[in-house]
Design a protein with these regions (language model features):
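N-terminal glycine-rich anion-binding loops that anchor highly charged ligand groups
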Residues: 1-6, 29-45
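N-terminal small/glycine-rich loop or linker at the start of catalytic domains
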Residues: 1-16, 72, 128-134
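Conserved, mostly hydrophobic/aromatic
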Residues: 11, 31, 103
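Short N-terminal helix-initiation segments at or just after the protein's N-terminus
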Residues: 12-21, 43-46, 101
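Alpha-helical scaffold segments that flank or form the walls of functional sites
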Residues: 23-36, 65-68
């Protein structure tokens, strides 16, 4: 079993993905001391309308600094499947490969087939891949979603 912490990424919903530098340093120091394997630090995205802070876009300099602060941890970013397509993957992810180990994808079960194609593109670049399937209570309304799970360990 592996443990993933998503405190920063999830906290971004309350701070517009901006965090005080001292807070990040204290958080990173704490994470280095804990038996957590993966640290999900934010999103990586194409430009979107409206203001979203640097932890929504996770530019290279942010990831580089986080990796220095947490050298023993595997960094994770999340992609919002509704905004990201296969054609975005190389430009978004290749520059961050030295710093990020795992890419998670936030996905609505109704878009899961499209998310599988996105996951294959991400995996082809050498990243670990995981899904953050949203609206879990709706699975029973779409039994076809469960059928798509077969063979995903490949």
């Amino acid at each position: 079993m592996k443990i993933l912490d998503c405190t920063i990424r999830d906290g971004g919903y309350y701070t517009n993905w901006d965090f005080d530098k001292n807070l990040i340093e204290e958080y990173a120091s704490s994470m280095e001391e804990l038996p957590i394997d993966y640290i999900e630090v934010g999103y990586r995205s194409i430009p979107l309308e409206g203001y979203l802070g640097k932890y929504y876009y996770c530019p290279i300099f942010v990831l580089e600094e986080l990796k220095k602060l947490m050298p023993s941890k595997k960094l994770v970013i999340i992609l919002n499947e509704k905004d990201i397509r296969v054609e975005h993957v190389k430009n978004l992810l290749l520059p961050i490969k030295p710093f990020v180990s795992l890419i998670r994808m936030a996905v609505d079960p109704k878009n899961f087939e499209r998310a599988i194609d996105l996951a294959k593109a991400v995996k082809s670049l050498g990243f670990e891949v995981a899904f953050n399937v949203m609206y879990m209570s709706n699975w029973k309304n779409d039994p076809s979603f469960l059928n798509l799970l077969e063979g995903l360990d490949d």
